[in-house]
């Protein structure tokens, strides 16, 4: 915790990211004579591991911001911070939120979070099914006992059945929500956007409050970068993979 600017007092506390995190944070803040409304929390977006904590902090009344890890490391280098430890990162992120004033994060609607969870589960199961099918192909091409082949075939079939079950749940969920159904229909009406891409685009676009196509492109990392200076620096344009500013 950073008090009174980057030159002010610093308080640190290690808190595990689990189901009791918000309760522990609130208890510690009470000892510091602070309330959620007094605190601006910033955390790096780390896959899906930040999502529950960010949502629970938001629901508890905190102002929450998410930082792009690449951007925060650039910020750290700009401050001359080369060391990377939890304590140093916490100080760097506190400075980041104080100086950059990142926008307030709002959690996606419950129907979007549920759709995202279904899609992630489908992707995991599909990957497992493909790996099991590759093993089956290998077993069929080698001297493998029949019991092993039967086991592999059953597992591949079970995984495919579960993929189909999840896909039915996804379709039913989209159909049950007028807003999701409308947006999904619009997305899949675009040439080259099929059902799977449409579902993933639906989650990305509805999970963030983009106000322009440029913002969405920056988030997805498809913004062209040109490197040209004078007569000596002329690199081929390429796509940015950095992602959003925050």
Q: Each predicted region: which residue ranges?
A:
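Short, basic/hydrophobic alpha-helical segments
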Residues: 20-38
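Short, well-ordered alpha-helical microsegments
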Residues: 49-53
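Long, charge-rich intrinsically disordered scaffolds of nucleic-acid metabolism proteins
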Residues: 55-59, 65-189
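Short glycine-rich, Thr/Ser-proximal phosphate-binding strand/loop in the N-terminal lobe
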Residues: 1-21
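Short glycine-rich phosphate-binding loop at a beta-alpha junction
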Residues: 37-46
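Gly/Thr-rich phosphate-binding beta-strand-loop-beta motif of the actin/hexokinase/Hsp70
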Residues: 1-5, 93, 200
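Phosphate-backbone recognition surface of nucleic-acid-processing proteins
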Residues: 195, 200-246
């Amino acid at each position: 915790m950073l008090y009174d600017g980057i030159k002010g007092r610093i308080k640190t506390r290690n808190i595990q990211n689990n189901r009791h995190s918000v309760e522990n944070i609130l208890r510690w803040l009470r000892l510091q004579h602070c309330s959620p409304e007094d605190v601006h929390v910033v955390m790096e977006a780390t896959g899906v591991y930040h999502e529950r904590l960010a949502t629970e902090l938001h629901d508890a009344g905190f102002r929450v911001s998410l930082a792009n890890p690449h951007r925060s490391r650039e910020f750290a280098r700009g401050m001359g911070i080369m060391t990377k430890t939890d304590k140093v990162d916490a100080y760097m992120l506190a400075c980041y939120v104080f100086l950059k004033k990142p926008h307030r994060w709002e959690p996606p609607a419950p129907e979007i979070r549920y759709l995202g969870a279904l899609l992630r589960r489908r992707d995991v199961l599909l990957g497992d099914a493909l790996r099991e099918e590759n093993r089956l192909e290998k077993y069929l091409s080698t001297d493998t006992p029949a019991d092993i082949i039967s086991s592999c075939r059953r597992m591949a079939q079970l995984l495919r059945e579960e993929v189909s079950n999840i896909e039915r749940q996804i379709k039913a969920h989209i159909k049950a929500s007028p807003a999701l159904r409308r947006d999904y229909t619009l997305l899949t009406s675009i040439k080259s956007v099929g059902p799977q891409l449409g579902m993933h685009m639906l989650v990305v676009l509805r999970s963030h409050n983009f106000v322009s196509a440029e913002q969405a492109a920056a988030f997805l990392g498809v913004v062209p970068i040109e490197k040209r200076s004078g007569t000596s620096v002329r690199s081929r344009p390429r796509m940015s993979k950095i992602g959003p500013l925050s």
